[in-house]
Amino acid sequence: MNPTERLEQGGSDLLLMLPGALMTPQHMVAAGLFSALAGRRLSLDLVAPDLHAEGADNRIALQTLERDWLAPARTRYRKVWLGGISRGGQLAVSCWAGRVGAVDGLCLLAPYAGGRLTTNAIRRAGGLAKWGATGDQLDDPDVRLWHWLQSPPPAVPVFMGYGERDRFADGMSLLAQHLPLQRCEVVPGDHDWSAWLPLWQRFLDSSPFDVRP
């Protein structure tokens, strides 16, 4: 497991940002996510934990996320946001949609919406409301996410965006239709930092967080 990265600047709010697959918290630092926040006077702390050691079944990762990160943070911060990149974004949406842990907002950079087998099945069924999953299929974290989105929890503020050339864009556009979004940001770029860093900067510039004196 890679070390957790933190930017603690006395913020009243916290954002837990989850790395994507094959990504470490250190990649997020190197890409400029932490320095972009440090350059703004937002009353926001940023923590990037590494949950990859929990394995492919995200039910364990979700339990760890709530027990070790979200629950302690709620005792310390006014508001706790959850976010992630790619697979990390999928885990963040799953945490909210599955009512695993209470969050005050979501920051989703190119959140992985599941394989085409699942998203195509939803489209063939005529939409999410008409689609159904069997008990065995619910062992798949991709399927569980969409099952939870059929009966979503109360809405929270959500920022979501992805690159216009992202190879997973079809699934993300479907996901965006089922999140409480005012709009989904689509920027030049692929499923990489060419899109993710500009999206992160847009999130920080439009975010609801207070400004430090």
Which stretches of residues belong to each language-model region?
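Alpha/beta-hydrolase active-site loop
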Residues: 56-75
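The feature captures the conserved acid-bearing segment of alpha/beta-hydrolase catalytic domains
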Residues: 128-180
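Conserved alpha/beta-hydrolase
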Residues: 37-56
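C-terminal catalytic histidine-bearing segment of alpha/beta-hydrolase fold enzymes
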Residues: 21, 57-58, 165-213
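Short, surface-exposed "cap/lid" segments of acyl-processing enzymes
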Residues: 1-41
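Gly/Ala-rich beta-loop-alpha elbow adjacent to hydrolase catalytic centers
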Residues: 83-92
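Hydrolase active-site cap/lid region
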Residues: 96-138, 196-197
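Alpha/beta-hydrolase active-site loop signature
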Residues: 22, 50-55, 113, 191
